[in-house]
């Protein structure tokens, strides 16, 4: 942890320990923080004892070991993207395919936010909140933009666009957005004309 650069990464053990430690501290100091009328973060920074901080780290390490077999489990083995069905309440399943996601919840300062947690019957954490769409736009003589959606454009599990952007989303690999007719050449599956 001393060598951690405080950046998330799929291969980062420190991210795993840091997030699990933070979750543990939230549970341990929530009540006294409210009683002191300060945020949990302020309480941890100003009132938590070294013993409390270390006990929470030991508990976090134990939880990771119990759930994943080793305390030094990389974040990407824990934090996953999974889209199996179009259900609003998703049936997450550790045995089914999923994709590692390097970024964390905005709770931990991540601008690319992926709010994940374990669900009933799972040990891995699956994201259900955060950025569902990310775009950057350059304005000028011509508009230029890059974007990605979480999963894919379609809500139909039978569509090739149901999950086709999941890997790209997890990697932060934004695709070009086509605004102009010449950009659309070779990239159009079908055309729609209102009234026809």
Give the role of each language-model region.
Residues 1-196:
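Long, compositionally biased non-active-site segments enriched in small/hydrophobic residues and glycine
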């Amino acid at each position: 942890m001393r060598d951690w650069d405080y950046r998330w990464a799929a291969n980062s053990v420190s991210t795993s320990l840091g997030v699990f430690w933070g979750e543990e501290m939230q549970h341990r100091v929530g009540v006294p923080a409210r009683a002191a009328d300060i945020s949990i973060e302020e309480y941890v920074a100003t009132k938590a004892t070294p013993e409390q901080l270390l006990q929470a780290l030991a508990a976090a390490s134990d939880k990771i070991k119990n759930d994943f077999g080793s305390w030094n489990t990389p974040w990407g083995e824990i934090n996953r993207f999974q889209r199996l069905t179009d259900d609003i309440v998703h049936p997450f399943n550790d045995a089914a395919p999923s994709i590692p996601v390097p970024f964390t919840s905005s709770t931990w300062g991540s601008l690319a936010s992926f709010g994940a947690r374990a669900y009933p019957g799972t040990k891995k954490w699956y994201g259900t909140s955060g950025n569902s769409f990310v775009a950057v736009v350059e304005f000028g003589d011509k508009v230029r933009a890059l974007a990605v959606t979480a999963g894919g454009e379609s809500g139909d599990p039978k569509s090739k666009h149901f999950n086709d952007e999941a890997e790209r989303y997890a990697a932060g690999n934004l695709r070009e957005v086509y605004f102009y007719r010449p950009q659309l050449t070779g990239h159009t599956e079908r055309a729609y004309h209102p009234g026809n």
